[in-house]
C-alpha cells in the first residue's frame, strides 16, 4: 500500500462516536490533507511502535515518558492510541499518542503525586527517591474521564512545516470522539513553553512550572520542570473551528519533492 493510500485508510479507520460528527469529519479531512501536503501520511500504530521510534531517535527526542510506555506505565492499545506519520519512503517522521484515564474518584494531583500517573505499580517500579509535586491550582479539579495527549515528535528535517499545528489537533479531536472526555491534559517542558509550543498546540489554560519531577526515569539527571496544560471539549471545538476557518492547508509543492 502506498503512503497516500495509507492516509486514505487512516481517514476510513477514524470512528466518530461522540461530538459534532459532520464538523469533525470536515476537520479530519482538512487536517489529514494538510499533513499529506507536507509529505506526511498518517496511520495508526501501537505503543510498541512508539517506543521503538523513540529509542531509534534519541538524538532528537528525549526518552519517552513512562505514561506512554506499556511497561512500566500501563499504556495499552485498548486504552489509548498512537498515530504515526510516514514520508513517501515509508520512514516514520512524526508521532502522536493519547491515553484515557478513569479518574471519577480521584484527580490529576493525587494521581501524579502518588506516581500512579507514571507507573502501573509505583511501589515496584519507581526509582529510589522519585517524586512528583503538583502546584497547579486546577489540578484537583481535573477528574472524571481525562485524556492525556503527548508522545509528540517530528524528525528534524520535518520541523518548521507547522505539523505541530496539525497532528496534535487530530489526536485531540479523535480522543474526543472516541472517549467523550471531560478534560484533555498535556505536560509540556519549560523549554517548549518558552518556544510558545503550547500556543501552537492551541492550549489556553496552562500553568508553567506546575509539575515538578525529582529523580524521574525520563531524563538522565532525573529532574523535570513541566507546565500543565488543560483543554475542555468546548475549548477544543472552538480551537478546531479556528483551524478550519483560518489554517492554510496549502504548502509549496517543492516541500513534497524534498520529503520524498
Regions found by a protein language model. Give the residues of each.
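Acyl-donor binding region in acyl/amide transferases
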Residues: 109-211, 215-220
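A conserved beta-strand-loop-helix scaffold within acyl/acetyltransferase catalytic domains
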Residues: 34-146, 150-152
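N-terminal capping/interface segment
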Residues: 1-56
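Charge-rich, low-complexity intrinsically disordered segments
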Residues: 192-260
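Short, flexible loop/turn elements at secondary-structure junctions
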Residues: 85-89, 100-102, 151-158, 190, ...
